[in-house]
A protein has these predicted regions:
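Active-site-adjacent loop/helix surface patches within enzyme catalytic domains
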Residues: 1-110
């Protein structure tokens, strides 16, 4: 897992574009971005997501290849990029808990 800038993320996206589209279209799909919360703490990152956004809004990447198939979404991983907010540990249906998404995380995800 390494910390990256938006400029690095943009380069990674450009470098992965052809491969991710080929993978998605092999299943008759368009490329998807899946936005998640990790159900972890603000500094807890997971390799299941291509991109993790910590509580400070810093961007962490688990791979150098955004077309790599990772286990972020059941039966929807091929041709998809998983983006997770490091947040929502112990969240409940009506309460996001002590680790609710921060304004900075939401801004960076947007």
């Amino acid at each position: 897992m390494r910390k990256i800038t938006l400029a690095e993320l943009r380069r990674m996206a450009i470098n992965s574009k052809v491969d991710i589209w080929e993978k998605a279209q092999s299943l008759g799909r368009d490329v998807k971005l899946y936005l998640h919360w990790t159900a972890g703490r603000y500094d807890q990152k997971f390799d299941d997501y291509h991109i993790n956004i910590d509580g400070n809004g810093d961007i962490w990447c688990s791979t150098d290849d955004l077309s790599e198939v990772l286990a972020h979404t059941w039966k929807r991983n091929t041709g998809a990029i998983g983006i997770g907010l490091c947040a929502c540990y112990n969240a409940q249906t009506t309460n996001l808990g002590d680790f609710a998404p921060t304004k900075k995380q939401i801004e960076v995800m947007a």
